[in-house]
Amino acid sequence: MLMITSFANPRVAQAFVDYMATQGVILTIQQHHQSDVWLADESQAERVRAELARFLENPADPRYLAASWQSGHTGSGLHYRRFPFIATLRERAGPVTWLIMIACILVFVVMSIVGAQSVMVWLAWPFDPSLKFEFWRYFTHAFMHFSLMHILFNLLWWWYIGGAVEKRLGSGKLIVITVISALLSGYVQQKFSGPWFGGLSGVVYALMGYAWLRGERDPQSGIYLQRGLIAFALIWIVAGWFDVFGMSMANGAHIAGLAVGLAMAFADTVNARKRT
């Protein structure tokens, strides 16, 4: 048995399983925290992964709905739940994912009340040589956000990718990626713009790079990022670099974070590639 992927939504998992059944491939679903899709005949793994990539690009394609009707599995025995918004967040996010989200929200609220400068004095990258031993500053810059759009954008991606990493690989792995990427992306960004910056985007880009390359090199890990999303991330970096949107972006942090994530994924998958 080989685990192909995992879906947070059991309906989506069933749609893919039903479609593959019409293609002559039998998959099974095991319900744990998420819906894990397993393949019994491992010789069909490459074919299934290719179909999965197409499915993820457009899971709402009518052919997948038609396959569900054709397979006759609407009474498959899966007990679907209607997740309210908060329950959906909780289903995908582990404790570290939640802790960072709460920290960012609390810092944002305090910044809104007392002003950004008052908070940056305590949390920003060391802006004076006398502060270089205040070690929290090398990481807490990631908790500061300067607009509602800024924090919503970063926390959405953090929840989506960071939550998946924590659920599949554990809290320890998410902590390591977060700490290393916050440190190195912050270091690069302060070389570009000085110490007055903030945001979780360097960590988010690290998670994007990690999830994409980990999925490409080690699909059995259950971690992946669709190629369309990594392409979007690269386009966003280019747009920020050339100031296409006229917004201030932490371009150094984005590039450094992405590089950190790719490097960590490569290191983590070396042994997996050797096994295959």
UniProtKB/Swiss-Prot annotation:
Q: Does the keyword Cell membrane apply?
A: yes
Q: What is its EC number?
A: 3.4.21.105
Family of this protein:
Belongs to the peptidase S54 family.
Question: Where is the chain membrane-spanning?
Answer: 96-116, 142-162, 169-189, 192-212, 229-249, 250-270
Membrane topology per the entry is: Multi-pass membrane protein
Under what name is this protein listed? Rhomboid protease GlpG
State whether keyword Glycoprotein applies.
Answer: no
Looking up Pfam families in the UniProt record yields: Rhomboid, Rhomboid_N
Gene this chain is encoded by: glpG
Q: Which GO terms describe its cellular component?
A: plasma membrane
Its keywords, alphabetically, are: Cell inner membrane, Cell membrane, Hydrolase, Membrane, Protease, Serine protease, Transmembrane, Transmembrane helix
User: Which InterPro entries does this UniProt record tie to the protein?
Assistant: GlpG_N_sf, Peptidase_S54_GlpG_N, Peptidase_S54_rhomboid_dom, Rhomboid-like_sf, Rhomboid_protease_GlpG
> Main EC class of this protein?
hydrolase
Which transformation does this protein catalyse, written as a reaction?
Cleaves type-1 transmembrane domains using a catalytic dyad composed of serine and histidine that are contributed by different transmembrane domains
Q: What does this protein do?
A: Rhomboid-type serine protease that catalyzes intramembrane proteolysis.
